[in-house]
Curated annotation (Swiss-Prot):
Pfam families: PPR, PPR_2, PPR_3. Belongs to the PPR family. P subfamily. PPR repeats lie at residues 91-125, 126-160, 161-196, 211-241, 247-277, 288-322, 323-357, 358-392, 393-427, 428-462, 463-497, 593-627, 629-663, 664-698, 699-733, 734-768. NCBIfam families: PPR. PROSITE patterns: PPR. This is Pentatricopeptide repeat-containing protein At4g01570. Keywords: Repeat.
Amino acid sequence: MRHGRGSAVSAAISGLSPAKNSPFPQLCNVLLVASLSKTLSQSGTRSLDANSIPISEPVVLQILRRNSIDPSKKLDFFRWCYSLRPGYKHSATAYSQIFRTVCRTGLLGEVPDLLGSMKEDGVNLDQTMAKILLDSLIRSGKFESALGVLDYMEELGDCLNPSVYDSVLIALVKKHELRLALSILFKLLEASDNHSDDDTGRVIIVSYLPGTVAVNELLVGLRRADMRSEFKRVFEKLKGMKRFKFDTWSYNICIHGFGCWGDLDAALSLFKEMKERSSVYGSSFGPDICTYNSLIHVLCLFGKAKDALIVWDELKVSGHEPDNSTYRILIQGCCKSYRMDDAMRIYGEMQYNGFVPDTIVYNCLLDGTLKARKVTEACQLFEKMVQEGVRASCWTYNILIDGLFRNGRAEAGFTLFCDLKKKGQFVDAITFSIVGLQLCREGKLEGAVKLVEEMETRGFSVDLVTISSLLIGFHKQGRWDWKEKLMKHIREGNLVPNVLRWNAGVEASLKRPQSKDKDYTPMFPSKGSFLDIMSMVGSEDDGASAEEVSPMEDDPWSSSPYMDQLAHQRNQPKPLFGLARGQRVEAKPDSFDVDMMNTFLSIYLSKGDLSLACKLFEIFNGMGVTDLTSYTYNSMMSSFVKKGYFQTARGVLDQMFENFCAADIATYNVIIQGLGKMGRADLASAVLDRLTKQGGYLDIVMYNTLINALGKATRLDEATQLFDHMKSNGINPDVVSYNTMIEVNSKAGKLKEAYKYLKAMLDAGCLPNHVTDTILDYLGKEMEKARFKKASFVRNKPNNNNISS
């Protein structure tokens, strides 16, 4: 110490024993703490003399509590005190204080060594300190050290408070360490089944059961991470334990999880179990509004919008008032299943009941309205959204721009995009991707490449969707050399080099001689004829079995009789297709190969090169790639149908179902198109009827496909009824719909009907295209023929009368 002052103080104090000889023990401690604090702050522990400093627990605690001393020097002092053993050992209070310092200052790497010293000193870690340590370690991501603390407590034979384990589980879930949380949970559940004997021979059950809050957090985490098998394992394990009881929130989580994963039977059985529990334990254990929201969401996912609407009507008179989430879920479900009239009705009721629609609700309504070809109504809805002060998002404008492009309003879409760019608002990478795709559709590749360059300049990353659209455009126009241009314009990231390497590798594989091991073996073996398609979409017996209700006692006091009836049904039919249509590019981290395969399938099939597409498909099958999307199978099946290879198309469909790839609306469009080409409009109608009865829906492409099939089969009355049905369901006919009705009526000789549809088309503001011109030429010739025929009949009639006279 400087100038010898410290040594003098130490010498003075060393001659005293604060506990016995000194009449001023507190003053001695104060002087000693001040001296030690100054020494530690200036030179650390190297100037301390163990023989001259009387260390006691009060002194150590005051040093550790001093805010003026650096935490690392406190830690050094704490370790320096080890050298005083066996004369001095740290107490539990001292360890608690140093642990608090370590946790507060982030020196958590010292925890394992401190625990080892604690064990040597024979000091036990208390419950409170263990919880603080665990929380700090988990927050800092030091999961191994946290497990070390748990092991340390178990070695001591100390049974931790269940709340400690609950906090650990919750913290791990929030840190997305679900595997670690699962291992701890199952370890706790195994320990809860263990039995031990006390001195009197009684059996003691070790209570390590986690709380419902921690379990609920874990189940939510597993659901969000799409860990289906782990979710089911936790659910079944807890259901099998008599001492663990699910609460209402647990049931709601499980209903939502099983429903979203396609297990409607499990979701309905859980609802039934909740109702039974409420009859025994009271209404507090029964379904609440969140339960009904989850069930309505599940029914909408299964395409059972009709059932969801009935449950909603029951809900309104059952004492459970619909909330904002209820309306949002129903509007989303109706918009996705093209029930726009129902969606707008619910939207109106939502406003009438005092709920304010948010951006998500308006986005769903805008998307559904534009897909239903109601451009004017969509624009009016957007204006209302702005007037009511609901903030539009990038997604809102993306829906508008994409909808304008798809409804033949490309100029309006480009104008809106340019206005947003000038303002510097509501434009993201998806907006650029949508506009770039439209430019590629129109063949304006130079503009698309410039747009990509601008996209990078503005700091947006160019995604695989945009690049694949450009590649398809290059191949369609034969611009093979333009692929290298992407390297100049897209400079950031490794995406473009990976795409070009993938392209070069596939082209080299396609040039290799094909293996002859599978010669004369069908690539897509079929299990039947394409005309046997009804067996694949389910039989009427399946639908009937779902309608059979198991015997149940009618509860006149039930608030949800229809929901009770659904819950008592067995073997609910699986949905025939998913509401979401398969995308060519999903742009997921693990789907690069499949995305690129779908892109090049589109390229080869658009050029009519079916053999090259089949070879590419075979290469990937040989590589063991099985996670193909519905887009892959739909593309292959559509090409075979167009070429008239119906048996092979059936084989593609069989392989699709064997690989558990869910069909979508595009799959059934191809099926109906194939049946129409085979002249079996009756089967096409039957497939569509079965589809709608089992929860399916029709989009405008499906309507157009079936109208065309019925018209070519001269079933004009049914085609007309379907056309009217489309309009009554809130879907405006497009140019393809009108062209089809004009053509089939013209060819059937119903010229007045054809002219009526032409006038309706123009009155609706639907712009004709080049196909319309061709059909109108044919209609004009037929009308001219009819005019000549009528005129010749009028001329011949007087002549015949003169001859007879």
